[in-house]
Amino acid sequence: MTPKEFKKTYWPDIAASCEETGLNPLFVAAQAALETGWGKSAIGHNLFGITATKKWRGAVKYVRTFEYFDDDKQGHRFPKVHSITRMPDGRYKYVVDRAFRDYTSVRECLTDHSRILLTER
């Protein structure tokens, strides 16, 4: 997807969502473009790579990813660990299946993304 196609596809939903939340639509669009490589690698309708924690009650999609940690004791974080390799710099590369939120629509994703950004921690 080209940047122009990305804008045509996602801008209407991003603009409408931001109108409701007060978030800057340019910020939201930029983050979505960065996270998906201009729409090339979105996980379902998940434009932001939002992972599914234990509290998440919606649908989940498992995707194989690479994660890097300073030790080899992080496997408990993932449903499946395929390999752990010590890198030359001393860090560990994990090949894992990671759980991502699987939204039914782009609007559902944008609503959840806004909620995450606007919730005080």
Task: Please provide the spans of the model-predicted regions.
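Catalytic cores of secreted/periplasmic lytic hydrolases that degrade extracellular macromolecules
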Residues: 1-121
